Regions:
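Short, solvent-exposed loop/turn segments enriched in Ser/Thr/Gly
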Residues: 4-6, 76-78, 143
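Hydrophobic residues positioned within well-ordered beta-strands of beta-sheet architectures
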Residues: 6, 22, 82, 93, ...
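Beta-strand-rich interaction surfaces with strong enrichment in secreted/lumenal proteins
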Residues: 71-72, 132-137
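Short coil/turn motifs at secondary-structure junctions
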Residues: 13-15, 31, 123, 152
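Short Pro-Gly-centered flexible turn/kink motifs
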Residues: 8, 136-152
Length: 152
């Protein structure tokens, strides 16, 4: 397969603590949801980041609720790598990451079923406004977020 590695460094050049969270949003071609099988190990898995999080099932799936425009799975305690195989187009996708900086994962798909997002995150959307759900860097500190994707 072919592998691409990406890295983001967040540096606090200011004079007070910098709250932030990071999440990448890669899109991968997919034939349709029914053809995709995920291989993901996570502690929890739900459709919302709010409230108590249910334990992740042994097999994580991404299905569309009737009448919904998208499908989402928010996962905590995600282990590297996350993988999926698409029996419709023959693609195999692996997302590898450093578990010490990426603790969450997201699966997302919207509208036409021509793609799937399989995303390493360390927080949730708007987490800087929720205590305990983001990272803070002190002045002069920096943190690197590195991940890779391999496609066969």
């Amino acid at each position: 397969g072919s592998t691409a590695t990406l890295a983001l460094t967040v540096a606090n050049t200011g004079d007070k603590a910098l709250p932030f969270s990071v999440g990448f949003h890669p899109y991968f071609a997919a034939s349709k949801l029914d053809n995709v099988a995920f291989d993901i190990d996570a502690a929890t898995c739900s459709e919302s980041a709010k409230g108590e999080q249910p334990a992740a099932p042994e097999t994580i799936t991404l299905t569309r609720k009737e009448g919904s425009a998208d499908s989402i799975r928010l996962m905590t305690g995600v282990k590297s790598p996350m993988r999926f195989t698409d029996s419709g187009n023959g693609h195999k996708v692996t997302v590898s990451f450093d578990e010490s900086v990426f603790t969450n994962g997201v699966l997302w798909q919207q509208d036409a079923e021509s793609f799937i997002c399989m995303e390493p995150w360390n927080g949730w959307a708007n987490s800087v406004n929720e205590a305990g759900h983001h990272i803070e860097l002190n002045p002069g500190e920096s943190k690197e977020f590195k991940w890779s994707v391999t496609i066969w």
